[in-house]
Design a protein with these regions (language model features):
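Beta->alpha loop/short-helix hinge microenvironment recognizer with preference
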Residues: 1-357
Length: 357
């Protein structure tokens, strides 16, 4: 039996029909590879193990098919998210944390779409803002960022989720608490992004929507200055008391694939696909109805480039400073190290369905 999510691509040859309509080279190879894996996920095409009854009088066998492990697969994403939570629980120190969401003006979204390398740059800038505030206070924080390209309605909406310790370790190896405020963080973020886009002007591929604004360096800087004068949305959470809340709550939210199966409906044998989502604007659950072609297009936007790291670590959580984390931070925060539990498909099956696959 095919996985439920694969039905979207296979029923009525939705995926192949959409792919044939696209101009040559318009669909990134990684998108084709991801969808191919998703369609084969959980089938014998991915390989399988076969279990046989040990009794010589019984011919009963059972095949357990392998999963695709694609980052865009919602089925495999459940396991990947659960494993990442375990990794976070074993890594982050037990101290206060804050979560910050860095967004861009909507006029910049298409620019990032046509210059996907900017995603890594804006992740680094978000971390640099927090690092600069902390270094001014003689503090080394622990930071991790998660790059998201989708909004709740699956539109293209690049933004950065950043979790940081609400403080950090000083040069004297003591702990110092800090609180981050939206106004200061926003102004630093806005300045650095504007400076980046001005400096990288020669390297940018201008989308059609910004053809006039990007016609010359002078026009481009004028466009950037217009948006620099406006307020940008940077959301800073309240301080959370411990690392467990950070790992479990944000781990389950941030690591999930773009399209959760639980929010999809109304697509069995029909061309229309329904998506339930909680609207930021109305604060209510809304329902979006998409054609098969529209769903394929939106899905293709959010497939990460091969080898691109969606999660990044900075400060004493960065690999280069793990020694500081292990020899100083765990001690002064009195963190009891946890061992990451290994998540397996068999264990998840047994916990959720009470059946040994």
């Amino acid at each position: 039996m095919l996985p439920r999510f694969a039905d979207i691509f296979q029923q009525g040859n939705r995926w192949l029909n959409w792919l044939e309509k696209q101009p040559e080279g318009a669909v990134r190879p990684v998108v084709i590879e991801s969808v191919t894996k998703i369609m084969a996920c959980g089938t014998t095409l991915m390989g399988y193990t076969q279990w046989c009854c040990s009794s010589p009088d019984c011919c009963h066998t059972k095949k357990v098919c392998f999963r695709c492990k694609s980052r865009s697969c919602p089925h495999c994403g459940v396991k990947a998210g659960a494993q990442w939570i375990q990794y976070l629980l074993s890594l982050v120190p037990d101290c206060p944390w804050q979560h910050i969401v860095f967004t861009l003006p909507c006029q910049y979204w298409s620019l990032v779409f046509h210059n996907r390398w900017l995603l890594a740059e804006i992740s680094r800038i978000a971390a640099d803002v927090i690092l600069e505030i902390c270094h001014q206070a003689d503090v080394e924080p622990g930071i991790f960022t998660v790059i998201h390209t989708w909004g709740r309605d699956q539109q293209w909406h690049p933004h950065i989720h950043l979790s940081t310790t609400a403080g950090g370790v000083t040069s004297g190896h003591t702990w110092k608490n800090l609180h981050f405020y939206a106004r200061k963080v926003m102004s630093m973020w806005r300045y650095r992004i504007t400076r980046l886009l001005s400096r990288k002007y020669p390297d940018l591929v201008m989308p059609d929507a910004l053809a006039a604004e990007g016609s010359s360096k002078r026009e481009w800087n004028r466009f950037l200055d217009t948006h620099y004068r406006r307020g940008w949305n940077v959301n800073v959470s309240r301080v959370m008391d411990n690392a467990t809340h950070v790992a479990v709550y944000f781990g389950s939210y941030l690591k999930k694939p773009p399209v959760p199966v639980s929010r999809l409906e109304h697509y069995a044998g029909q061309d229309e696909i329904g998506l339930r989502y909680n609207s930021h604007r109305t604060k209510r659950e809304e329902y979006l109805l998409m054609s098969g072609d529209e769903f394929m297009e939106r899905f293709s936007w959010h497939v990460a480039d091969k080898g691109f790291r969606m999660v990044r670590y900075y400060g004493f959580l960065s690999p280069a400073k793990r020694r500081l984390l292990e020899e100083v931070v765990y001690i002064i925060t009195e963190t009891v190290r946890k061992t990451a539990m290994q998540i397996t498909w068999r264990g998840m099956y047994q916990r959720l369905l009470k059946v040994d696959p």
